[in-house]
Amino acid sequence: MTRTDSSSASLEAFSLPEEDGGFLLKHLYLKHSSFSHRFSWVDTFLSGFEGKRIGRKGIQALETAINKEIMDRGYVTSRVYIEPQDLSKGTFYFTLLPGIVSDIRFSPDTWGTWRNAAAVHKGSLLNIRGIEQTLDNFNHVPGQKAHIRIEPGEKEGDCVLLIELQRERPVSLFMTLDNSGMKETGKLQQTYGLRISNPLSMNDLFYFSWNGDAEPGSDRKGTHGVNLFYDIPLGKDRMTLSYAHDDYRQTVDYSVVPFISSGKLERTRLTWSHLLQRKAYSKTDLLAGILHKTRHSYIDGTEIGVQRQKTTALELGIHHKRYIKESLVEGELTYRRGVPWLADPGPTDGMAGEATTRYNMYLGSLHVTTPVPVAEDYRLRYTMDLYFQKANQPVYGSEFLSIGGRYSVRGFDGENTLAAESGVVMRNELAIPLGKSGQEIYGAWDYGRVYGPSTQYLLGKELTGCALGFRGEKGPFRYDGFIGWPIEKPEGFQTAKRTYCFLISAEI
């Protein structure tokens, strides 16, 4: 169930107007209908005026206050009204005229279906939050823009929802080029992808991408991978399925006999989300999912059996998004539990104090974006991203949180990292728009810390770095580049004095 009601400051501050005469009303209530349970707060509100003398102005003021509150709670086509009644008996009631959705339909010449995207249904009580969720489901599809008109129905209080869709580019191609790779496997990395909007005509989304190193061909080092993604709305729910397969190979030259080390990683995730609450400036979703991973490691093509991994984990979390004036705050908290389904036990599972695949882990993230006024018509933008991981038991390295690189602590080249069972990363950024060009320069300051049993084998636990960058877009192209510097690192931790990073992407 989606909650849309809350206590109202305007009702709490309401007072009856002063007037002479009136009737002594011992009982005030809302006349019951099939939807009265949605408006139980009206009875609570009215009970506060029982035993008082109320005249015509007072009754009209109550009606106005209740209808304003109904509107504020999103029931934009519902209202209360006053039926003829004898007030001399000391009883007074309001009658509810519920706003019912009598029909939902597409505008003419629109193909596809609205049924799985609609968060409202025929015969339901119309709430504007349901329309907003429906719009989100339609507009979640790239190249698709929805508008919903509320038109009067045949009966008083009834309404018809007319959905108008604008669609463009149902199929698009995209590519990226960056230098996020490792020296041993290829610094230059490339991605090519295909995205299809509405592949099943159900406001769904599918994309496929291939990625790999972009350096001269060699059998002795490199990476390549495949990603699949499918997403479909189901009213107040959403289902997402993703799959990733990555291969890498590198030559180990510092041994007596050089050899090729390689590996394969697969990751499959099924996620379900459900809208718990939606208000004018916030929404909350319940999240649940299952994550399955496999890992294989090889030396000169021969698998290292002891390093083989096949794990499954369940996830349960909550996601909250809130607008506070012109700022956005978005947070997520997830509990992850390793389970034996479709999984193989780890070599040290069940050993006290050793790594296990049956772990309990908490993960969280917080995103804040807020404008920083510096002149009447000019603002900077501050962004903060915080995420953490807390494992309650020792876990295998594949579950570690790693810091030191462009996606964690900028200013480090990523060739060496600090990784452990638990940790926290905070990324701060101040962006300066360059007029209305769609470009900006930005400064970044990042901090990361890892902790857990494995830190005893590390050179240290903390990294701090900074960066100065430039990003923007022009036509189908987007670009981002920055120079980063390490500020604080453990003694002996090897990284470049300056890190140069870039990313170029295009979509057609």
Model region roles, listed by residue range:
Residues I150, M175-N179, Y192, F206-G212, ...:
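Transmembrane beta-barrel strands of outer-membrane/channel proteins
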Residues Y298-Q439, G443-Y447, Y451-P453:
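C-terminal outer-membrane beta-barrel translocator/porin domains of Gram-negative envelope proteins
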Residues M1-G181, G193, N211-H224, M384-L386:
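Periplasmic polypeptide-binding modules associated with outer-membrane biogenesis and secretion
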Residues E473-I508:
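Predominantly the C-terminal beta-signal and adjacent terminal strand-loop region
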Residues W111, N127-S327, T495-E507:
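Gram-negative/organellar outer-membrane beta-barrel architecture
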Residues I196-N198, I232, H274-L276, H320-R322, ...:
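Residue-level signature of outer-membrane beta-barrel architecture
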Residues Y75, G143, P170, S201-N203, ...:
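Strand-connecting loop/turn motifs
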Residues G123, D178-S180, D213-P216, Y254-F259, ...:
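Extracellular loop and loop/strand-boundary signature of outer-membrane beta-barrel proteins
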